[in-house]
Amino acid sequence: MGIKVYKPTTNGRRNMTGSDFAEITTSTPEKSLLVSMSKTAGRNNTGRITVRHHGGGHKRKYRMIDFKRTTDNVVAKVATIEYDPNRTANIALIVYANGVKSYILAAKGLEVGMTVVSGPDADIKVGNALPLANIPVGTLIHNIELKPGKGGQLVRSAGASAQVLGSEGKYTLVRLQSGEVRMILSTCRATIGVVGNEQQSLINLGKAGRTRHMGIRPTVRGSVMNPNDHPHGGGEGRQPVGRKSPMTPWGKPALGLKTRNKKAKSSKLIVRRIND
């Protein structure tokens, strides 16, 4: 992926950058793998806002991604590399030898014409999926399962990767992108390689309109709200927070408070936390 820099023909264009989509090979997705999406604007079934700053944006269709990779020992050929509006990573359309088509995350270095395969006996090659127990120490991986057969949940965004550090009993030690070291069942699957489109984080949207096009609404500061809307709100003119520390809209400390559930059973599987 390359970064395209726009000329400052207007104020909105100044400093704006975008992807050159050099890796994309087609603009027409596979119809059989598309699902219609209805907009919720961040509301739940009762109409209350459960996710703030959502609404509007361009209409999308969901691409059904195969995060499980359970079609073992059947070679698949990469047919296309495509753009996916629902994620930062690109996706690859693969066609199995039996004719079945599927979408997977496009790893860095994966190109049209290459072959991928999944299963315990798969080679250590970009795009192949296999259990953690069969992946050598030091290998970079992505799309990692937390429960065998559930499908990849970790390390799926553009440019992300994790590294296999070793094994301990029935668990495999994996260092995640954040620096956290976690024990994951060795029967869980992962895909070899780094997620592609790694320069996506360098894109400068340049203007508010591109953000709205993505379905993201403005983020309003709490200090300009009313006191019934935010702990920072109210007062005549500009006022300080009025608390010991900044608060979230729901009245909890905004800085430094650990939000992880202390009773979470998976805590014993975390060997090294992010801030240790």
Curated annotation (Swiss-Prot):
Q: Does the keyword Disulfide bond apply?
A: no
State the residue spans of region: Disordered.
219-268
Q: Name one GO molecular function term.
A: structural constituent of ribosome
Please give one Pfam family short name.
Answer: Ribosomal_L2_C
Q: What GO cellular component is one of the record's annotations?
A: large ribosomal subunit
Q: Where are the transmembrane segments?
A: none
Q: Which family does it belong to?
A: Belongs to the universal ribosomal protein uL2 family.
Assembly mode: Part of the 50S ribosomal subunit. Forms a bridge to the 30S subunit in the 70S ribosome.
Q: What does this protein do?
A: One of the primary rRNA binding proteins. Required for association of the 30S and 50S subunits to form the 70S ribosome, for tRNA binding and peptide bond formation. It has been suggested to have peptidyltransferase activity; this is somewhat controversial. Makes several contacts with the 16S rRNA in the 70S ribosome.
Q: What is this protein called?
A: Large ribosomal subunit protein uL2
Q: Which gene encodes it?
A: rplB
